[in-house]
C-alpha cells in the first residue's frame, strides 16, 4: 500500500494550504500568546476572519459570518476550557475547528469530531479503528 502524494490529495491540511499567511502572521505578531500557542488570540482571529497586516500583507477570510462567534471561540480556547461547536449540518463547524487548530497549534489534525450522540467516554476511551486494524491494540490506537 502506498502513501498518498501531494498530487493525490483532494485538499491539503489548513496549515499547508495557508502556510504563507500563518508565517506572515507569526512574523508580525508581537502580542502575548497563551502557553503553547503558535499565534496570539488576535492573530488567530485575524487568520480566520481575514484582514490586512501592518506590513500590507492581506490575510484571506476563512470564515464569513458573525465575528463575535470566532472571538468567543478563541477567548474560550485561550483559557483552560474546552470548546464545543454544535449546530445543524453545513454551518462550517469542522472548517472552523480545522483552522482554529492550524492557527493555534500548527497542526489541524488535532481535532475531535463526533455527533450529538457521541458521549465523552466514547471520545476519551474509544478505539482509533484505522490504527487498531493496521497495527493492532496499542496506546496509539486508543
PLM feature segments, named:
Residues 2-142:
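AAA+ P-loop NTPase catalytic core and its hallmark functional loops
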Amino acid at each position: 500500500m502506498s502513501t498518498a502524494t501531494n498530487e493525490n490529495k483532494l485538499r491539503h491540511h489548513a496549515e499547508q494550504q495557508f502556510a504563507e499567511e500563518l508565517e506572515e502572521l507569526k512574523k508580525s505578531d508581537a502580542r502575548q500568546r497563551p502557553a503553547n500557542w503558535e499565534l496570539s488570540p488576535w492573530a488567530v482571529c485575524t487568520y480566520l476572519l481575514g484582514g490586512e497586516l501592518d506590513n500590507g500583507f492581506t490575510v484571506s477570510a476563512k470564515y464569513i459570518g458573525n465575528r463575535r462567534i470566532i472571538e468567543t471561540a478563541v477567548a474560550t480556547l485561550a483559557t483552560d476550557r474546552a470548546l464545543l461547536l454544535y449546530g445543524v449540518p453545513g454551518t462550517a463547524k469542522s472548517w472552523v475547528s480545522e483552522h482554529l487548530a492550524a492557527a493555534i497549534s500548527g497542526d489541524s489534525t488535532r481535532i475531535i469530531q463526533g455527533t450529538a450522540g457521541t458521549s465523552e467516554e466514547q471520545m476519551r476511551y474509544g478505539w482509533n479503528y484505522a490504527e487498531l486494524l493496521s497495527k493492532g491494540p496499542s496506546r496509539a490506537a486508543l
